[in-house]
Amino acid sequence: MLDKIIRIATRQSPLALWQAHYVQHLLQANHPGLQIELVPMVTRGDIILDTPLAKVGGKGLFVKELELALLDGRADIAVHSMKDVPIAFPEGLGLVTICEREDPRDAFVSSHYAHLDDLPAGSVVGTSSLRRQCQLRERRPDLIIRDLRGNVGTRLAKLDNGDYQAIILAVAGLKRLGLENRIRYAMSAEESLPAVGQGAVGIECRLDDDHTRQLLAPLNHRHTELRVCAERAMNIRLEGGCQVPIGSYAELEGDTLWLRALVGAPDGSQMIRGERRGPAAEAEQMGIELADELLSLGAREILAAVYLDNPAR
């Protein structure tokens, strides 16, 4: 069973390579002697850096090339940040494993200010995420929010060069890259509700590849799977892409799941929020019901306007 080399498709960014090596380590810890080969590749999202993500087109922006490698046999598994995984998969492919989640919160990063509330009016804050932008603008309408693209190192360099007074990044990414010291503070879910699946690593493979699926089975983290299942069910019901102003965060308290979600207008003028508590075994249904509640409260109109402005989504 271990004589076949498992090939991992991954993006070439430092964070993506960290995730691929992380999965490699888990696989080899569970299956000593297993041979693994990384297949680094460049995605469309890595190439187009001069356009806001929402306008490039959010569906599969960072995963399509990896999925093509699975379909044509160049790779056996693809490792993704769950927040980048589209709501639908190509025929024959699927998400089979979700690894244990790292801290899902957003990080406030600044060279001179300790807290978002400390920023003077007119300060420039960098983020390309519509989800982060709408929450920032609701809380601090006096700030200037500008797009910020590139890998983590590039973004930090732009901050250090004085292009921004602060930037918002994922806590998980900074921790994984050994850059935890750059975090001024981790923003609470009340302050900045995370993205669907943020902080979790997902593994995609061919659904008919039973050998690979058996190898991956021990890597699945059930608690993380339930939380991400609820978040993704909500997003699927909303027909949300990866680059839309949707936040969702599920927490497990014993056997009880607490799911929070929001849909916001990018300018911060409207914010629809909701939450659900229920049995963890009903995670998917809770996500669907919460999405229906948000839609009934006006989320449909907000998202329609976003898609009109960003038809590529």
From Swiss-Prot:
One of its GO terms (cellular component) is cytoplasm. It is an enzyme of class 2 (transferase). Keywords: Porphyrin biosynthesis, Transferase. Signal peptide: none annotated. Pathway: Porphyrin-containing compound metabolism; protoporphyrin-IX biosynthesis; coproporphyrinogen-III from 5-aminolevulinate: step 2/4. CDD domains: PBP2_EcHMBS_like. The keyword Thylakoid does not apply. One of its GO terms (molecular function) is hydroxymethylbilane synthase activity. HAMAP family: Porphobil_deam (MF_00260). The porphobilinogen subunits are added to the dipyrromethane group. Tetrapolymerization of the monopyrrole PBG into the hydroxymethylbilane pre-uroporphyrinogen in several discrete steps. Belongs to the HMBS family. This is Porphobilinogen deaminase. It comes from Yersinia pestis bv. Antiqua (strain Angola).
